[in-house]
Regions:
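Structural motif
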Residues: 24-25, 75-78, 98-99
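Alpha-helix C-terminal capping segments
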Residues: 69-70, 88-96
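Fold-independent oxyanion-binding glycine-rich loops
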Residues: 11, 29-30, 81-82, 90, ...
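Conserved N-terminal alpha-helix of the aminotransferase class I/II PLP-enzyme fold
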Residues: 35-84, 109-115
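N-terminal glycine-rich, Lys/His-bearing helix-loop that initiates the first secondary-structure elements
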Residues: 1-47
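Conserved PLP-anchoring active-site segment centered on the Schiff-base-forming lysine
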Residues: 92-110
Length: 119
């Protein structure tokens, strides 16, 4: 598949129920559970599925699959803000108990994150 095609259609093969060719935007915060036990299993990560949009939803899943395909990666992660992206990057690159060296001229909240939260 050409890069341009991946950018437009990657991560979504069309909806067999509606025939939609483009991925829909799911404007919901919560998802239905089959039962209380099913909801508990979702939140305990015992089964796959959607539980709350801030964690994951079908719209962001398509975006993540599309970005991974464009970049030739195994996966991708979308987050709600640049600060969240900074946090994830620091947590995944820095070793526990180590040091993070940064300039005090960073965005103030990033500096606070580095000095107070990620220690």
């Amino acid at each position: 598949m050409r890069r341009e095609t991946i950018a437009i259609h990657g991560g979504f093969d069309g909806d067999p129920t509606t025939g939609a060719a483009a991925a829909p935007i799911y404007q919901t915060a919560a998802f239905l559970f089959d039962s209380a036990d099913h909801g508990a299993a979702l939140f305990n990560l015992e089964v796959e599925g959607f539980r709350y949009s801030r964690i994951a939803n079908p719209t962001t899943n398509v975006l993540e699959e599309r970005v991974a395909a464009l970049e030739g990666g195994l996966g991708a992660l979308t987050v709600a803000s640049g600060q969240a992206a900074t946090y994830y990057a620091i947590c995944n690159l820095a070793d526990g108990g180590g040091e993070i060296v940064c300039t005090p001229q960073l965005y103030g909240t990033t500096h606070t994150l580095d000095r107070k939260s990620v220690v």
